[in-house]
Amino acid sequence: GKHMGGGNEDYTTAKNALQEVRNQTDKFGLLEDFSEVFSYDNKNNKEIIFAIRNARDEYNMWGDVTYNNNMFPQQNILFGYMDENGNPISSLGDKVKVNGTIRYPVNKDVYTKCFNDNDTRKRSTLQAAYEKKEDGTLSLYGLYPAKFLGTLLDGADTRSPLDDYPVYRYADCLLLLAQAKAFLGEDPVEE
């Protein structure tokens, strides 16, 4: 690239390597449903090129509690709020059996300004918790992750963070290929 004397030769090398991956359509591709890319029940799907694997009874990169503690609210607090349709969050079932201390709350602007309502990634990335006002209207209170929810193991009352962690996705390959083509003055529209 632009560092250490690189240039078109580096971009060409990158483009060729990325095209090799893109051309393996039997092995890699984009999923129709973005939420399925990160689903515990859909590990090693067609969009995943390389991931750090996590499984039950093995050491995992989530440290069993780190991600949950930092990103999720306590279940008893979360259950006091509503979803966007005014239904109690507790009615969402196993999907919200999480516990944490939400040390890193997501800024509400990420949800309201970075995504529009037609963006399918919005509700597949973040879930909103609403407060029901006295007049019956809903007010956005906070957010919690919709990705990397883990799984509910037999006999457990909270989810275990056993999701694989994608390092390279097919979507990354397409974006990098488009960037390499753009640096070479080629048309990246196909990607």
Enumerate the language-model features and the residues they cover.
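Specific register positions within alpha-helical solenoid repeats of the TPR/Sel1-like families, i.e.
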Residues: 1-5, 175, 182
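Elongated scaffold/linker segments in the mid-to-C-terminal portions of large proteins
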Residues: 17-20, 26-174, 181-183
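Hydrophobic alpha-helical scaffolding
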Residues: 4-7, 40
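Enriched for extracellular/lumenal, surface-exposed ectodomains of secreted and cell-surface proteins
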Residues: 1, 24-25
